Amino acid sequence: PFEFLMGSGTEAPAEFTFFLPDHHVLCMAEVCTQTQHNLLTPRGAEVRDARLWAKVIDEARVRFGARTDVLINSHNWPVWGQDGVHQFMLEQRDIYKYVHDQTLRLANHGMTIKEVGDALQEPDFASDALHIRGNYGMLYFNARAVYQKYYGAFDGRAVDLNPLPPEA
């Protein structure tokens, strides 16, 4: 049998994870992978919800974590053992929550979309967790995505509302 958990609005508009209880295997699809995802894809798409992403990871951890011996995902290598799975899911959850919460904190202190990415520093918990460090997705880009989700892409400078086109 399968046990499903909807994860729509995380990596994709329609996403789910599943648990195989007879095998103690949790498939997190692309919700938890061996990298930090982009919250806004460079190719263009709707900004992904970092707060929801963290919530879905935590819900999966609570529902399936104590029964999981192996975590698999769509593109990368597995995570083995309950302790490893637990730590992996906590770090994945925490990086999305950190980007979300700290970006809003910086924005509420008056920073623009161009400033939040540079101001957001890697959290201490990420120093030894290679799967959440900037590789595919990165803090700079994800902070700008969170800012855009809540405040739009406007940087607060009137001159940037209708800039002149680059010269040919």
Give, region by region, the residue ranges found by the protein language model:
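Catalytic core of the metallo-beta-lactamase
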Residues: 1-51
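Divalent-metal (often Zn2+) His-rich catalytic cores of metallo-beta-lactamase-fold enzymes
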Residues: 19, 25-26, 35, 51-115, ...
